[in-house]
């Protein structure tokens, strides 16, 4: 009940305050973000995987994945537990780099440059390709400081501009009205759904081009899930979203395209409605019909 009450306090319009967006400070921040990424928005295929195989030690998790993600779309990665979809997702912004025994073959490119090349330093890559995890992970700092943590780290804004960023992004995710009078409070006093929205605001604050989502609503109640799904739809085409989900109904609701992984291989991919209603591979049909899972 507390979760429902908390989310009812959120602005249902899912829109940035027009007056705020028109302020000079907000314009300055957008200018800084554009200056950091002069190549933003050019290639149609923003992320491309070429014959990618991934593993840990002697165990191969993913084999021979060839796929391209179109800019400004939502792609769902589906498949049984252990099929490799989360490993693939976490490799796109190199979250697996520090995992013991991680190895990769083939290449993943972002804006036509290998994510492992010197063209992409790791800090900048993870700013441009953000991530939202399965469980909310707010930092042990105030609500306001959570939103602007990355902005400060990347020196995108400073001083009073940070307050503008915090308000702008909290409004964007619809959380501002619920927290505007307690920005100095601990985020751990928020409901689970509100914490996930805070983490989304934090990810958006640094101006990513791609957002990776690893089962972002699996730990949330249905009301929070519905709200976040609606919010994700407002983020495209400005962003490219790649979402791992075990919820097939969610994949159908939110995505333009779907990739089906099974036993470490990309079995089938295509337009979401087509894949669910007219799958071309027997394993895909068995999975989307619920006969394997």
Where are these regions (language model features)?
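The feature captures the beta-strand-to-loop junction immediately N-terminal to the Walker
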Residues: 78-80
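Conserved ABC ATPase "signature" region
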Residues: 107-114, 159-181
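ABC ATPase "signature
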Residues: 269-270
């Amino acid at each position: 009940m507390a979760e429902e009450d908390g989310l009812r306090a959120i602005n249902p319009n899912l829109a940035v305050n027009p007056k705020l967006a028109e302020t000079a400070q907000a314009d300055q921040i957008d200018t800084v973000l554009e200056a950091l990424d002069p190549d933003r928005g050019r290639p149609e295929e923003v992320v491309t995987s070429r014959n990618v195989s991934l593993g840990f030690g002697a165990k191969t998790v993913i084999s021979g994945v060839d796929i391209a993600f179109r800019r400004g779309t939502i792609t769902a990665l589906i498949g049984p537990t252990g099929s490799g979809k989360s490993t693939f997702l976490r490799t796109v912004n190199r979250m697996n780099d520090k995992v013991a025994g991680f190895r990769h073959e083939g290449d993943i490119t972002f804006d036509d440059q290998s994510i492992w090349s010197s063209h992409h330093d790791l800090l900048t890559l993870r700013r441009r390709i953000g991530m939202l995890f399965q469980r909310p992970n707010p930092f042990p700092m105030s609500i306001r400081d959570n939103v602007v943590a990355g902005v400060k780290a990347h020196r995108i804004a400073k001083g009073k501009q940070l307050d503008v960023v915090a308000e702008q992004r909290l409004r964007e995710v619809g959380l501002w009205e619920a927290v505007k009078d307690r920005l100095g409070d601990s985020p751990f006093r928020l409901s689970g759904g509100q914490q996930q929205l805070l983490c989304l605001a934090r990810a958006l604050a640094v101006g990513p081009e791609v957002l990776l989502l690893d089962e972002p609503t699996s730990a949330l109640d249905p009301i929070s899930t519905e709200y976040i799904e609606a919010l994700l739809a407002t983020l495209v085409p400005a962003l490219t979203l790649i979402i791992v989900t075990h919820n097939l109904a969610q994949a159908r609701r939110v995505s333009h395209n779907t990739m089906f992984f099974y036993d470490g291989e990309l079995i089938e991919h295509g337009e979401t409605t087509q894949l669910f209603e007219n799958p071309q591979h027997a394993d895909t049909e068995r999975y989307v019909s619920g006969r394997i899972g």
